[in-house]
């Protein structure tokens, strides 16, 4: 609760700052001033509603109120930029007529930049995810292994059965050895999305489909979600490990649940039955789960999602601070690598900026082929 309140206070501070910065440079009539004030009040009210009632509100309100935090951050970034330019113009020794002309130019530029930002953001957000191929070289691997990593599909009120069907069709074209679903598959009460998820039974691969939950599964009821997913043609790796395709494939529950009594991540338990002669792949929703690794764990590759590659720049800079790894393949330490997918779907409004969605196609190759 304290974290939620702190998060809300930060958002309200951003809203207040944006309000003050823009107000000092925008010329508003009386009616416009009330509308301007009302916009920021509604924005803060939406954020408060989301923070305190997100687990019980209807899906359409969840999407609407969650989007308010994105709007606050974007408004703050643009307001700060506009304020900085306008303040500089005021301080430079221009002729009054030139200063006025430059301020008008900046104002028009601000509106055009804002329009272009949202146009590009919605274009990327609504675009269907494309397959992105990445080669990864591993020690102790005998032969090539082809993997599809699906994360952050966020199946719910906006991303429904047609979206899942598209994903399945794209995946099946690659004829891979296994399909891994790295969490945040469900973003709605499971009773409302069961039919949307049924096409996942049509995923084709040599060894099958494997899944770990993300934080959004906990938001919407982890037990009923896992109960339903157990009826589908997939294996849930909840702190468990399987041996197939010449690797140890291990999975853990999400980092979000680390303080829970049940469905909490336990890396030691997940690795208990692995074969040390084979490379070990750990499927964990959040990249920062890697901070829990010890040298003795000897993980070769961690596969994660959660970040959406930041979803909207420059929000991605804050995500990187929180998660360390944002998107793509990284060398963590020693022999441990981590791949973070940008995700196939989106959270909140369909907006992505400089963070396109993806279906990650990972070609695991013996290191001697590098």
UniProtKB/Swiss-Prot annotation:
Superkingdom assignment: Bacteria
InterPro entries: Calcineurin-like_PHP_ApaH, Metallo-depent_PP-like, Metallophosphoesterase_sf
One Pfam assignment: Metallophos
Biological processes annotated in GO: lipid A biosynthetic process
A GO molecular-function descriptor: UDP-2,3-diacylglucosamine hydrolase activity
Cofactor mode of binding and number, as noted: Binds 2 divalent metal cations.
UniProt xrefs under SUPFAM superfamilies: Metallo-dependent phosphatases
Presence of keyword Transmembrane helix: no
Family from the record: Belongs to the metallophosphoesterase superfamily.
Protein's UniProt name: Uncharacterized metallophosphoesterase jhp_0380
């Amino acid at each position: 609760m304290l974290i939620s309140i702190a998060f809300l206070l930060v958002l309200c501070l951003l809203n207040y700052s944006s309000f003050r910065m823009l107000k000092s440079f925008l010329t508003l009539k009386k009616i416009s001033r009330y509308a301007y004030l009302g916009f920021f009040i509604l924005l803060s009210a939406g954020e408060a509603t989301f923070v305190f009632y997100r687990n019980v509100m209807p899906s359409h309100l969840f999407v609407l109120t969650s989007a308010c935090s994105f709007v606050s951050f974007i408004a703050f970034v643009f307001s700060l930029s506009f304020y900085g330019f306008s303040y500089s113009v005021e301080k430079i020794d221009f002729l009054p007529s030139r200063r006025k002309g430059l301020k008008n130019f900046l104002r028009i530029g601000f509106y055009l930049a804002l329009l272009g930002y949202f146009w590009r953001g919605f274009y990327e957000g609504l675009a269907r995810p494309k397959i992105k191929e990445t080669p990864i070289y591993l020690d102790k691997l005998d032969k090539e292994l082809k993997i599809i990593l699906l994360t952050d599909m966020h199946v719910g009120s906006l991303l429904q059965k047609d979206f899942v069907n598209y994903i399945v069709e794209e995946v099946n074209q690659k004829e891979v050895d296994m399909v891994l679903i790295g969490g945040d598959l469900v973003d709605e009460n499971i009773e409302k999305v069961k039919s949307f998820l049924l096409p996942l039974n049509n995923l084709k691969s040599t060894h099958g489909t494997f899944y770990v939950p993300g934080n959004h599964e906990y938001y919407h009821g982890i037990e009923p979600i896992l109960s339903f997913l157990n009826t589908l043609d997939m294996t849930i790796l909840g702190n468990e490990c399987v041996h197939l395709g010449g690797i140890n494939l291990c999975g853990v529950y999400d980092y979000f649940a680390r303080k829970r009594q049940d469905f909490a991540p336990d890396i030691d338990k997940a690795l208990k039955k692995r074969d040390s002669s084979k490379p070990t792949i750990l499927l964990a929703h959040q990249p920062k789960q890697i901070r829990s690794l010890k040298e003795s764990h000897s993980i070769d590759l961690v596969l994660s999602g959660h970040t959406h590659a930041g979803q909207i720049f420059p929000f991605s800079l804050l995500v990187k601070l929180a998660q360390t790894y944002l998107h793509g393949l990284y060398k963590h330490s020693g022999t441990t690598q981590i791949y973070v997918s940008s995700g196939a779907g989106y959270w909140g409004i369909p907006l992505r900026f400089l963070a396109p969605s993806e279906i990650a196609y990972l070609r695991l190759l013996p290191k001697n082929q590098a």
